[in-house]
Amino acid sequence: MDKVVKIDGKDVKFRATARTPRLYRAIIGRDMISDMNRLQKAFNPDNAEESNLDVMNLQIFEDTAYIMARHANPDMEEKSADEWLDTFNMFSIYEVLPHILELWAINTRQTSTSKKK
């Protein structure tokens, strides 16, 4: 699934598919599912500014945003999250993270019903 988010006055396209966790592991070197579980637990969608977002959670957010943007734009010139973040003057975690979590939730929700009762 794709989603366009306005960041620092620019339209940025993000993509989350079954391939996204593989890209994350190959490029970032960590398990995306574990990282996203940690990030989801720390983020309070009802009051974003009261979320428990430490330095590691910020790193996970930045890496995830970069991977989803790179997945949507394979010809992206920036080869690291740091290079990509340098293209923005302002990149608010509180504005972008809800969109990233929404994409992740849509991508990971169960699409079939369990046959066990």
Where are the model-predicted features located?
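Short linear motifs in exposed loops
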Residues: 15-17
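Charged interaction scaffolds used for protein-protein
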Residues: 1-11, 30-53, 59, 71-117
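Generic secondary-structure boundary signal with a strong preference for alpha-helix termini
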Residues: 20-21, 41
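N-terminal first-folded block
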Residues: 21-28
